Curated annotation (Swiss-Prot):
It catalyses: (1S,2R)-1-C-(indol-3-yl)glycerol 3-phosphate + L-serine = D-glyceraldehyde 3-phosphate + L-tryptophan + H2O. The alpha subunit is responsible for the aldol cleavage of indoleglycerol phosphate to indole and glyceraldehyde 3-phosphate. This is Tryptophan synthase alpha chain. GO terms for molecular function: tryptophan synthase activity. The keyword Amino-acid biosynthesis applies. Pathway: Amino-acid biosynthesis; L-tryptophan biosynthesis; L-tryptophan from chorismate: step 5/5. Pfam families: Trp_syntA (PF00290).
Length: 293
């Protein structure tokens, strides 16, 4: 398990796009543009018909992807077809993970894994396939830490990281259970507070980072980051990385609605990626430097 390596030397830029939005071929180009623009890890959304944890922008992207024919097996082919040299993470929902393989005769077997589940049940077939095509981690927004045992076991077996989303309200025992099982990085869900022309980090974001400070895992902040200035402020406040989805999905949606060429949209995505990565690097330079002894 090695997503932590993306955070080792500098703040990581982690963009998100829904795989297959607005169509298979264009989406390949868009993901590759993000890699050229400086992405350190790329989160690929595997669409699910009931994306309860997503905002309107990403819900619309998921609808476009589903209408274009995206399925789990097509998603895995998509990953294999990508020409990128950065770690890939799959973001999807547990029902889809759990049900994968039920209709695949090659996945059905009377054999059992160490937990006693048959190979045709539970998350194991999905995790095995994800690892085989090159996915290095999973983000599962609807999976509570206390119910993550079977997925954690499968991820351990196939060397995948399991990333949890920590909201400002995630505290106490629930937070402890998540952090005991997380690997790769923590997705810290937070918002930017904007007052007039001044973009700043709200108290909830700083509180979340402070609560996680004793845990030796990278903290990547997402939710509401749209500009290089946002990225700069988040990293200067102590984040190890930034996660950006809606701002990038908006570029895809606008290009699709306007009938822009794939190349034009890819160029805009690459430029936005560079802006965000450069903002994160500026934020790292602004952090207080430890005193030399």
């Amino acid at each position: 398990m090695g997503l932590e390596r993306a955070f080792a030397d500098e703040p990581a830029f982690v963009p998100y796009l829904a795989a297959g939005d607005p169509n298979y071929e264009a989406s390949l180009e868009y993901v590759e543009a993000l890699a050229r623009g400086g992405a350190d890890v790329i989160e690929l959304g595997l669409p699910f018909s009931e994306p309860i944890a997503e905002g309107k922008t990403i819900q619309n992207a998921i609808v476009r992807s589903l209408e274009a024919g995206m399925t789990p097996d097509r998603f895995f082919q998509f990953v294999e077809d990508l020409d990128v040299d950065v770690p890939l993470v799959c973001m999807t929902y547990y029902n889809l993970i759990y049900q994968y393989g039920e209709g695949d005769s090659e996945s059905r077997s009377d054999s059992e894994n160490a937990s006693g589940e048959t190979a045709s049940q539970g998350p194991r077939p999905f995790v095995e396939k994800a690892a085989a095509v090159g996915i290095e981690g999973l983000v599962v927004p609807d999976l509570p830490g206390e119910e993550a045992g079977p997925l954690r076991t499968a991820c351990d077996e196939f060397d995948l990281d399991l990333v949890f989303i920590v909201a400002p309200t995630t505290k106490g025992d629930r937070l402890e259970r998540m952090l005991e099982q997380v690997s790769g990085y923590v997705y810290v869900q937070a918002r930017l507070g904007v007052t007039g022309a001044r973009e700043d980090v709200d108290d909830a974001t700083e509180d979340s980072l402070a609560r996680l400070s004793d845990w030796d895992v990278p903290k990547a902040v997402g939710f509401g980051i749209k500009t290089g200035a946002h990225a700069e402020r988040i990293v200067s406040a102590g984040a190890d990385g930034i996660i950006v989805g809606s701002a990038l999905v908006d570029i895809v949606a606008e290009g699709h609605e306007n009938g822009d060429s794939t190349d034009a949209v890819a160029d805009r995505l690459e430029a936005k990626a560079r802006e965000l990565k450069e903002g994160a690097l500026r934020g790292a330079a602004e952090r207080p430097q430890p005193e030399r002894t």
